[in-house]
């Protein structure tokens, strides 16, 4: 069996131990001191679970706002090389058309379910429901008043994949949208 030899691993109720990990079909099949492990590569390192990135706009020269499956795949492959196994594709305040295109691309990728890298776990919708007084790097002309109906249209376009929304609760409609998001299990 191929795997990792002499690596440090945290095991629940035991602690950090030096052990071997056998891998079959891309999955952990064995953890223990069996010596019959053919090393994938020489290491004396630490094995940790894959990281989850809940706010990433892009990587590898691609951006979630490119609105294409190819861009999301580029991000996915880049993140996997860095130890990230799942991520939320993060949008930004842009035209409704650009946001919708980005969300539709996430829907396509998630429906297909085939990943060569990190899994697209959903969407972090950053804006457009932000404060016009505090836009930061977001373009003011695309800031929208917090609105549950508009959010629902975006969520439908994403295949109900929106998990987190960055918004301004202090603006008119903000608390109403927060309540709506809370009711459907979306973090605001």
For each predicted feature, which ranges?
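Histidine-rich, glycine-flanked metal-binding segment
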Residues: 1-48
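Histidine/acidic residue-rich metal-binding segments in metalloenzymes
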Residues: 36, 109, 145-188
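Short amphipathic alpha-helices and their capping/turn segments at secondary-structure boundaries
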Residues: 36-38, 42-44, 102-117
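Amphipathic, non-transmembrane alpha-helical secondary structure
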Residues: 69-77, 81, 100, 104-107, ...
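Glycine-rich phosphate-binding loop of ATP-grasp-fold ATP-dependent ligases
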Residues: 133-143
């Amino acid at each position: 069996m191929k795997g990792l030899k002499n690596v440090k691993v945290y095991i629940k109720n035991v602690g950090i131990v030096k052990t071997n990990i056998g891998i079959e079909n891309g999955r952990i099949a064995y953890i223990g001191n069996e010596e019959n492990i053919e090393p994938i590569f020489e290491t004396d390192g630490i094995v940790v679970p894959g990281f989850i990135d809940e706010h990433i706009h892009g990587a590898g020269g691609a951006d979630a706002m490119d609105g294409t499956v190819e861009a999301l795949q580029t991000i996915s492959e880049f993140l996997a090389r860095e130890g990230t196994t799942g991520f939320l594709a993060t949008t930004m305040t842009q035209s409704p058309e650009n946001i919708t295109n980005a969300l539709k691309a996430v829907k396509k990728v998630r429906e297909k379910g085939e990943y060569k890298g990190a899994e697209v776990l959903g969407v972090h919708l950053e804006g457009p429901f932000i404060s016009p007084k505090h836009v930061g790097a977001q373009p003011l002309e695309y800031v929208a008043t917090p609105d549950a109906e508009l959010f629902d249209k975006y969520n439908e376009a994403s295949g109900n994949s929106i998990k987190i929304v960055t918004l301004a609760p202090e603006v008119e409609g903000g608390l109403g949208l927060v309540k709506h998001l809370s009711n459907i299990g979306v973090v605001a």
